[in-house]
């Protein structure tokens, strides 16, 4: 919802896809009457046909309590969600930004990590559904960029917490 607020402030048109697995409609309630905002209940593991010029791909449960609740869905969201968003970007010529995570480094052996550091990962641990899903999403992005010349950016987000996020008290 912070990104939506900023994009609407910049007078951008925003189409928000959400399946409400970790989000709440109330997070974007104040934008529902904005003519530049459209909310679609949709799971990105399913393809969607839209006409857009930018895609901000943020879909994936990022909290351990969420991604461990259904680890297969978490991996599927990272893989199929990214695959579907990349397919959309390719079809309409949109730029895409993938929200990845510092978790792709696994249990790093160097601090701080450089962009060239490949990490020290556990592919079968309890957190692997999230970590490896994001690594796979980054791989898909790199392959789409090389093979289809899709304009892609990847941001690796480290620890975050703030307004609109669910706390353990609410779960």
Where are these regions (language model features)?
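Conserved small/polar residues in nucleotide/adenosyl-binding loops
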Residues: 169-171
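Conserved GTPase G-domain signal focused on the G5
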Residues: 164
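N-terminal Rossmann-like NAD(P)+-binding domain of SDR-like oxidoreductases, especially those catalyzing
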Residues: 1-160
């Amino acid at each position: 919802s912070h990104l939506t607020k900023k994009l609407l402030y910049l007078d951008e048109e925003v189409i928000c896809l959400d399946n409400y697995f970790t989000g709440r409609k109330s997070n974007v309630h104040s934008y529902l009457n904005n003519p530049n905002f459209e909310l679609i209940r949709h799971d990105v593991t399913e393809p969607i046909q839209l006409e857009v010029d930018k895609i901000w791909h943020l879909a994936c449960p990022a909290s351990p309590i969420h991604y461990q609740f259904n680890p297969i869905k978490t991996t599927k969201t990272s893989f199929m969600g990214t695959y579907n968003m990349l397919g959309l970007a390719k079809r309409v010529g949109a730029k895409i930004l993938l929200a990845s995570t510092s978790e792709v480094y696994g249990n790093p052996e160097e601090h701080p990590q450089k962009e060239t550091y490949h990490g020290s990962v556990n592919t079968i641990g309890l957190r692997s559904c999230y970590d490896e899903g994001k690594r796979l999403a980054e791989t898909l992005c790199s392959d789409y960029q090389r093979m289809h010349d899709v304009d892609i950016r990847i941001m690796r987000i480290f620890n975050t917490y703030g307004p609109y996020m669910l706390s353990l008290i609410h779960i």
